[in-house]
Amino acid sequence: MANLLKTVVTGCSCPFLSNLGSCKVLPGKKNFLRTFHTHRILWCSAPVKPGIPYKQLTVGVPKEIFQNEKRVALSPAGVQALVKQGFNVVVESGAGEASKFSDDHYRAAGAQIQGAKEVLASDLVVKVRAPMLNPTLGVHEADLLKTSGTLISFIYPAQNPDLLNKLSKRKTTVLAMDQVPRVTIAQGYDALSSMANIAGYKAVVLAANHFGRFFTGQITAAGKVPPAKILIVGGGVAGLASAGAAKSMGAIVRGFDTRAAALEQFKSLGAEPLEVDLKESGEGQGGYAKEMSKEFIEAEMKLFAQQCKEVDILISTALIPGKKAPILFNKEMIESMKEGSVVVDLAAEAGGNFETTKPGELYVHKGITHIGYTDLPSRMATQASTLYSNNITKLLKAISPDKDNFYFEVKDDFDFGTMGHVIRGTVVMKDGQVIFPAPTPKNIPQGAPVKQKTVAELEAEKAATITPFRKTMTSASVYTAGLTGILGLGIAAPNLAFSQMVTTFGLAGIVGYHTVWGVTPALHSPLMSVTNAISGLTAVGGLVLMGGHLYPSTTSQGLAALATFISSVNIAGGFLVTQRMLDMFKRPTDPPEYNYLYLLPAGTFVGGYLASLYSGYNIEQIMYLGSGLCCVGALAGLSTQGTARLGNALGMIGVAGGLAATLGGLKPCPELLAQMSGAMALGGTIGLTIAKRIQISDLPQLVAAFHSLVGLAAVLTCIAEYIIEYPHFATDAAANLTKIVAYLGTYIGGVTFSGSLVAYGKLQGILKSAPLLLPGRHLLNAGLLAGSVGGIIPFMMDPSFTTGITCLGSVSALSAVMGVTLTAAIGGADMPVVITVLNSYSGWALCAEGFLLNNNLLTIVGALIGSSGAILSYIMCVAMNRSLANVILGGYGTTSTAGGKPMEISGTHTEINLDNAIDMIREANSIIITPGYGLCAAKAQYPIADLVKMLSEQGKKVRFGIHPVAGRMPGQLNVLLAEAGVPYDIVLEMDEINHDFPDTDLVLVIGANDTVNSAAQEDPNSIIAGMPVLEVWKSKQVIVMKRSLGVGYAAVDNPIFYKPNTAMLLGDAKKTCDALQAKVRESYQK
């Protein structure tokens, strides 16, 4: 049995397991009884995972012994990551001292400190430099490696065959960090790029140190200082890093490369790309340029000779894999430069690009300072070690993704750009057998990959296909149809009163359109709340139809009283909630307010009317005009924070004046007045109670509930008006118009009522937020619509009361069912559009009442609210790049979606802990926070507000970026942040802040996904293609705070999770925000 087990173990493909067969049993001091259960191993049907548990493996980090080498293979953060994964880590004493990492730092991260021999004998050894002779121990490091162990290091196998022979004798498996394929999936573990990035930056710093003038140009009292001119040859990682650093220091930067893509990158950094007249592509393999033709090189030399006479600093990075670096600048060119110039040769280790370079030295040749250091990354040891450590930890996690066992498989058959390609390219020796170089992968892209057109480019091409004639013809057709419709209304008008009402409706709609567009997005929530309150003027319709004495005496009067009661809930509750929200936007530095003084115009308006009425004047129509203008002022007042409270006051004055004018025109008896007052008082009391108790985070469902009341009031009013007017239809010339408007108002009110209730249920959590996609729902909705439209035929044709009231009852039921089926098919994340559409419906229902009762006030206010909701719906749809029909019918996909296969997202994500996040926050000077609905759901606005306050006190620039559809109703996040005390002037909209992301040090994404998804711009086939998003990935660093890597509402994977500048801080949003707040406070109190 022992032999059988030994055979199984030694035959395993993972080199660590082969050691288990030859392990020694150490004698112990006590005797133990051990039962050897073989049957569970031999006959168990459960599959056995390949590899070896992480907890049984030790990772060793030796001290680098190469001369002047200051780097270390793993930073304390890297150690912590491996320990968290399950590895045991041992670090040689003093290994990180030159990189400013003490032994105590490593101990705190979970590592053990041991000697060189013990560390090198680990299962897996990670190094920076390749193994070499240890002069202190008098033995080669390769001879100290564990037999059949694994080594990860820079190896350069083509240049070090002797080293490979030594490693082969130890049966080592070797992963060469210099052989990581330069493919997209491997960007996170490309150590050559990491080191080149540091070398490029350090080259500019050294050049500036040895250059005798400023880099940036200056005009001083002592004279003008011209900017330094820098030429950078080679647009790889090092060259681009140099260009970015030099440009940020104010120099004039020029860049040269044989590859067109590299020249574009130079241009994007603000450098001037240089080209020769001869056109020849320099695209090579593995991220390097190819060798060029003789003619091209001659033209290149001519360009360089000219540039040497002009520039002050030369930085060259040109390399050819496996060969000596090409000489690009001869001695004559260098000597033609101005005295005091500096040249930095980043290719010095491979011989150098300058004929005058002395590798590893700094010297001056005829007044030109030459920097030929070959250890530039080591001269920034802390940063270099941190990046190299990140490369290694990401590589280990990528090649062995299993959570329990360490295992990877080396295959000779693999596709280009896959993990199989990465593993096979990186592993240069397996179990002592040299397998370098790797075989050619399959499916290699031919030449440079075709650049996929962005969504913006596709949209521009689509727009270009529309000819000016077609564009003008479309516009002319729209105006023709509109004017034809107006002519039709004039011909069909039964009387002059209808034409006047249409005129009022049209002008009010235009005024509302232009007024609402001026409202700042931050005040969209108060706007919806105040329109909710104003829509309570459906009470006017109820008052006009009320009758009886202390109690209603007929069915129609009872319906009217109920409509008045319901509308009063809206009025009182809506204005109080609006006032609460606006009070939250107050800042401590704002001047005092005396809003009670607006009682003066309110008293003058209402009191003056009552005095005029007592004097015998009938000025109800003028009162309606004044009330309508006040309602316009209410919407206009919300255009800015400074006038928002005035707007709410004007809304109250307008509604109060309208109700007073209605009562004055009716002149009810005392008993009926008592009934009216009682209905309004009871409704108002209930509305105030609800508004006082509601939490601001529950505002969307409150708005939805209030919308349902408006819809129900419209239905009740229309049915009551039909019942009251029915006896007069035979002699009334406008009877048909009255019937049509009553039928239309009933339909709109029914959809608004039931749709709002479903929206309320979804937002409150009573109903599931997910869309309810009934089979054949479109046919069902079409049938309900056909039934509703068809019902008007018998309603208009049959003059009997029974038929009429039956048709109104039927359309009420059908529209209510349709409101349910439509809204239930819409997911919770689309509720902003649903609420704004319902808001618009409530306005059109109010207009229908205005036409029905021939009331100018209801028509004016209804047009305002209807246009307000329509504009907000349009804004929401534009923010999602979706059509209104797509949202309302429960559809998916934007108007720009191409319909092909979405791009595949590959790569690994980076996870950090709270301490890492605090370090990033502490180091950042400019921070943007982009919250999503997750912030609302977790109610994490308070710790975030306190965090922002602390960071601002430390001199950091902290702002918020809000997407229009980030919450569950327009402007919800603005109100929540205001509630927590965040000043509104640091809360910016998407269009205001998107251009600032490239200059931002850190972005905190809290509970957002689709609104920051780069697939909207990068993938034309994505269902969110073309959707405007917050471009957070353009910042220097992003921290995404989410529960998991799961998709958002649109069910689209987010590429930013896998971008190299993104770190994932996973966990509950509220707990994470609380912890961040506490950690930041603790760090600043030290």
UniProtKB/Swiss-Prot annotation:
It comes from the Eukaryota. The chain crosses the membrane at residues 475-493, 501-521, 527-546, 558-578, 596-616, 622-642, 646-666, 672-691, 702-722, 740-760, 778-797, 801-819, 833-853, 857-879. The modification N6-acetyllysine is found at K70, K397. Residues 44-474, 579-595, 880-1086 are mitochondrial matrix. The transhydrogenation between NADH and NADP is coupled to respiration and ATP hydrolysis and functions as a proton pump across the membrane. May play a role in reactive oxygen species (ROS) detoxification in the adrenal gland. NADP(+) binds at residues 933, 965-970, 1009-1011, 1026-1027, 1042-1049, 1068-1069. PROSITE patterns: ALADH_PNT_1, ALADH_PNT_2. This is NAD(P) transhydrogenase, mitochondrial. Its main location: mitochondrion. Residues 723-739 are cytoplasmic.
